[in-house]
Amino acid sequence: MRSICTTFLLRKKVLSLGKAKEKSVFLLLFARLFVPLQIVMIVCIAEKPSVARDIARIIGATTSHDGYMEGNGFQVTWTFGHLCTLKEPHDYTPMWKSWSLTSLPMIPERFGIKLIDDNGIKKQFSIIERLMQQAERIVNCGDAGQEGELIQRWVMQKAQAKCPVSRLWISSMTDEAIREGFQNLKDQQDYQPLYMAGLSRAIGDWLLGMNATRLYTLKYGQNRQVLSIGRVQTPTLALIVNRQKEIDNFKPEPYWVLATVYRDTTFTATKGKFTSKEEGEQAFQTIEGKPFTVTKVEKKEGKEQPPQLYDLTSLQVDCNRKFGFSAEMTLNLIQALYEKKYTTYPRVDTQYLSDDIYPKCPQTMNSLYQTKFGGVAPYAALIKPIGGKPLKKSKRVFDTSKVTDHHAIIPTGVIPQNLSDAERKVFDLVARRFIGVFLPDCKFSTTTVLGEVRSAATESQPTENAIEFKATGKEILDPGWRVVREEKKEKEEEDDQQDTSLTSNSSPLTSEKDEERTLPTFVKGESGEHRPTLTEKMTTPPPYYNEASLLRAMETAGKFVEDETLRAAMKENGIGRPSSRASIIETLFKRHYIRREKKRLVATPTGIELIDLIREELLKSCELTGIWEKKLRDIEHQKYDAQQFIQELKAQVTDIVRDVMSDPTNRRITVAPPEPVKGKKEKKEKK
């Protein structure tokens, strides 16, 4: 009997012919002559129908059936995201059906999965099950990530599939990527560590979520209202609550700034602020009426590198700052662009490309050059200066060692058409960021001018006194990559000033708005009159979180860093995954733990009460949750044992239950109903 391997290789040959239908049909008939008694079926399973249709079209499965497509020796079927889930407590024992403190902690001896209770899901699964049990080989075409691996593995386990499984692993949904993927199918066993990390995450979330939610609801809740506790959502809520308390407890304090205007240029005292009015006034009197002398003029030229390519979090941050898009909305938009083949796989946490992507970049750039929206080619003028030249190759862009499963988000080279306004905005950010990394550095000149005002010695002050002042200006000599930046809108600038804790791509050039100015020509030793001022100001509290700054805080476990290299290192201990952070924020809204006030994220009284109530650092500490995330990544990279992780978690959950049960207080929390959004009613009436 001819081996399945031979037939499989023959089909791979058919795939490589693309649209050469005559050759494809000839080879298919040739194959059938040698396998007359048995039709060997390869079942491909995708994560959603739209992806399945694209795959089916490429591999020649063009005949539609109920729940799958068939042709060319392939059957292509699909899930609808998750078809299976971990069993619920009552599936293990009837004792866990009712909520009772005496039944805690709930720790199954062995975790199991079950079909989600939905008629549509049950029908589709029965089709998948039948196809898989008859298949000679399965190709797992699930989303190329941890969650996608988990979705398909659970379905195959539930269907009791026994045949060999191959893995389609691609970073974009273009026809070329699908063909290349099928010509280079992987062994599913290569992705076992990825599956174990996903499984460990799911079990960990079950153990902590199920037990802690029941524990806190029964111990501290009332009126049968659920107090939801989660491994990621609770530390995220704690970030918001703690920031809010900082703001509420903040007491403004006055300080005074000494400055002077010389030749229409404002110079500020290098001493910094004065915390005492008397000290400030004394300094003011010292310089009043005395000449200002320039002591030093220094000019330096510098370069600013282009910002790195987007990962999911940095894209969500920029979309929130520029357009007000929520993290969830941005994820949905970039996912849609990926499924339409316009951008690469979005759920990534790297800002690098592997070296093998470099040869494909000129074609992508050429496609962007031809791209038009409303008859206008927005990228042609940006690309023209580097047209016909080899694209520069920088280690800040191409570094295979910084890429694991997927590379940074970039355009695929397919010219986008029929995009919604929101999709176009997101695509535009990705396209401009991609173009920017191949443009020259921005060149600028920095001018620093130091001056002083000296006072003569007096009876009360026997020594001569001098107060130093400084002014800094910067001038763009060659914008380089900065041409890809669109002018900031006034509203966005206001948002940036309100949240200085957030910087997605900071640089010395953009750190201070008042330094973006060109100074007059000053000469060392020149002197003249000046107008000193002493201005009283008040210290300000830290800003409220918005979605952009919260995403950054989740990424770095609550530690704010502006340096890109340091931020990349901090990602190892961030809380949540890039793909899950948006849903975590939405969960906090749905639980009425937080609400929006314009762009601000504000904790509700219930959210504040809940965090105040939780004493166990394990439940609300960003650092500890970040360590968990690090262990899950280590499981994926075979540096940590999954079984050990789960055993540790079981012990921690047992400790939490014991500690909360021993609380002698009778504290209670009431989940408040959602507060009405101001202005919502009026808007409705206007319609």
At which residue positions do the language-model features occur?
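Intrinsically disordered, low-complexity regulatory segments
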Residues: 37-206, 210, 496, 501, ...
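Short hydrophobic targeting helices and cationic amphipathic motifs
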Residues: 9, 15-17, 27
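Metal- or metallocofactor-binding catalytic centers and their adjacent structured scaffolds
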Residues: 276-310, 316
